[in-house]
Amino acid sequence: QDKIYLYDLTNTYFEGRKLDSKLANFGRSKEKRSDCKLVVLALVVNVEGFIKYSNIFEGNTTDNTTLPQIIDNLRTQTSQEKRAIVVIDAGIATEDNLKLLQEKGYDYVCVSRSKIKDYTVNPNGTIRHLMTKDNQFITLQKVEKQKETDYLLKVKSTGKQAKESAMKSKFESRFLEEINKIETSLNKKNGVKKADKVHQRIGRAIEKFPSAAKFYDIEVVEENQIATKIVFTKKKTSQQNDQELGAYFIKTNLNTENELSVWTIYNSIREIESTFRCLKTDLDLRPIYHKNDDATMAHLHLGILAYWLVNTIRHQLKQQKINHSWQEITRITNTQKVVTTYGKNKENEIIYVRRCTEPNEKVKKIYAALKYKNYPFTKRKSVVHKSELKKNKTQHSSKTNDG
């Protein structure tokens, strides 16, 4: 029985117009293919990556509307003696959905949909430091907020901080460049100087770079409705925002004080991300070329069946400390080949000999973990006799004449 369920959705796009399809609809493509119609695939996966439940929705289905149906079906199709934990991402974690999970008898772990402000930190509380598998340094710290009953965990990542800082600097420099252009035009002969026009230009710059503009106070100095100067100063809140770069908040209704346990449970959602990546990339789930909805459903269901086989193999390998992706497994095992040699003997008969090449050490390691033989067969020999050759030639000749 599973104690943790990971729930998420993905979508894949169609090639073609799909005019008569009920499934295909325009929506928010996770692959940025806004020009194509989509179909949505919802999966519930356990921490070992095995699919416990799946459903297919129309392409315009939003993430946060699917949970009620999934939870009801999951309850009827799985047996749970203990209270299970559902891990979801921010797109699904609306207040209504979190309330629904509690009512249905589930605990939840999710990322807060927005950055939590005005929180307090226990001065005597502990800050945990750890290194992730991809060599990212993170800190874990419990925080509290008034009227918030959930356990809140602040997670700060150096990798995420560097990325967000670079993006902030990029947009900020572009915003200031726009403001400087507007100010420079005030001193040009044919530049825009009318105050209302200058305000419009500043408004467009703010609309274009809202994430950077919110940290600046901008004032236009006027004389007789003519702008003479633009004064912009940086707000103090910008420094406070810099301190929060790279941080996100995990919330849960679990009764726990273990920061590492909460983060580990939430981090297991990487497994469902790996599932979607395997389905789309390794098993060619995307794009979909089928014309009718029945063929589309078959395509998606066959992809899920193929994933079951892939994950079973990967699960067995992981138990032996082999953590390769499916792409890497196939690359390694494809180094062993079957070689077919043929020639004619004195009786003019064709002789075929098939042999397997020697597997390298990496292949042997995978075979040993899966309890496979190093060779599917040692040597196979077959002979095509003269009578069979003549018969085949006669049949081929008659087919040619008939055609």
Annotate each language-model stretch with its function.
Residues 1-403:
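Anion-binding and metal-coordination hotspots
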